[in-house]
Amino acid sequence: MATSSSLPRLRSRTVARDAGAPAAYALGALLLAGEAAVHVQQFVAEFYGVRWIGPLFVANAVAVVVTLAGLARARTRPAAALAGIVISAVALASLIISYGQGLFGWQEAGFRTPVALAMITEAGAVILLATALALRSE
C-alpha cells in the first residue's frame, strides 16, 4: 500500500504559513508596546527635560499607540505594520546615531538596561512585522 507523503507535508506548510502571519503581527504588536513602554519610562525618568529628545520619546510612544490601534483591525493591519516598521527602524537608527556623533545635542554614553530593552523591542518589531507582511503576500 503506497501513500503519498507530499500531501500531509503540503497541508502542514499551508497551515504554518496561514498561522505565521497572525502570530508575527501579534508578536510584533507586543514588541511595539514594549518599545512604547520603554520610551515613556525613559521620558519620565530621564528625558523629560532634554530638549528635542524628550518630546521625541513622547512622539514615539504616541505613534506606537496609533499603530497598535491600526494593527487591531484587519483592514488597516498591513499599513499599520509598515508604520510600525518605520517607527521602530527610525528609533533604532536614532539610538545608534546618539552613540556616535549625537542626535539633536544628545550623546548617549554607556549601555544601560533601558537601552538594551529598546534595541531588542525595536529590532524585534521590525523583523516580526516585516515577516508578517511577507507571509501575508504569499
Where are these regions (language model features)?
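Membrane-interface extramembranous regions
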Residues: 2-138
